[in-house]
């Protein structure tokens, strides 16, 4: 038995292809490019994914899919929302995940996780739930997220687990809801995404940003990243 709620993943969960830049994911060249992308992510980051995937009980297929979708496997610089790195995490998300972990997750952060986070961002030792991080602390976190790939993957994977536990209903950790919330924000989505919807239902939900609905297809559609992972035994 694992520590956390078990995740149920059906791949593909929807019989649609993701469309981006006029290319369908049924396009042979796009499929080859995405298989190559996943292989490169495994080659470059499997050690970190294995370590933190095991810690937070998230399969490498899911972590790789998020990295591929969020950053294309590149250590991306901060965007206008201050999201950065392989898993496009923001400083505020780091702070919130650490200080509010116990509000949603029954299993406390392990000593291993706390020690690693404290080493990566020393200011985390002084985090508290009542005081958001200052500009100086945000910059410290931003630097760690941008320059430390293991920290980015570790905290990104922790965020996935936090969301899985926060959004579970009737003991089910719904990966669809997690994907939408990771992309558009937990607090923005928690009232718009209730019960345990299928990917198809979420894609057709006009209350969810178009980008987030495309995000779902990119991960869970036919020839999406999770589908390609399992088809090619990565």
Named regions from a protein language model:
Residues 33-35, 47-48:
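A short, structure-level motif marking secondary-structure boundaries and short turns
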Residues 44-54:
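Amphipathic, Lys/Arg- and hydrophobic-enriched alpha-helical face
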Residues 45, 59, 152:
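Hydrophobic (often cysteine-bearing) scaffold residues that line and stabilize catalytic clefts
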Residues 45, 62-63, 215:
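Hydrophobic side chains within well-formed alpha-helices
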Residues 57-74, 86-97, 156-158, 178-183:
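Short, functionally critical alpha-helical segments immediately adjacent to catalytic or ligand/cofactor-binding
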Residues 78-85:
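Acidic (E/D-rich), amphipathic helical modules within compact regulatory domains
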């Amino acid at each position: 038995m694992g520590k956390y709620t078990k995740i149920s993943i059906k791949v593909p969960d929807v019989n649609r292809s993701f469309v981006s830049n006029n290319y369908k994911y049924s396009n042979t060249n796009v499929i080859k490019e995405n298989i190559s992308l996943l292989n490169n992510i495994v080659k470059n980051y499997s050690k970190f994914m294995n370590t933190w995937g095991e810690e937070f009980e998230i399969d490498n297929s899911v972590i790789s899919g998020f990295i591929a979708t969020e950053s294309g496997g590149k250590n991306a610089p901060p965007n206008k929302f201050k999201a950065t790195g392989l898993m496009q995490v923001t400083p505020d998300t780091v702070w919130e995940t650490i200080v509010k972990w116990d509000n949603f997750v029954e299993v406390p952060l392990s000593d291993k996780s706390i020690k690693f986070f404290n080493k990566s961002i020393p200011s985390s030792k002084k985090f508290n739930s009542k005081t958001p991080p200052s500009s100086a602390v945000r910059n410290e976190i931003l630097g760690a997220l941008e320059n430390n790939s293991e920290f980015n993957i570790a905290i990104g994977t922790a965020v996935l687990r936090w969301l899985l536990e926060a959004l579970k209903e009737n003991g089910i950790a719904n990966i669809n809801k997690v994907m939408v919330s990771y992309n558009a924000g937990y607090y923005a989505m928690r009232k718009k995404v209730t019960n345990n919807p299928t990917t198809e239902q979420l894609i057709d939900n006009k209350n969810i940003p178009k980008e987030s609905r495309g995000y779902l297809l990119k991960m869970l559609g036919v020839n999406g990243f999770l589908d390609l992972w399992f088809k090619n035994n990565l």
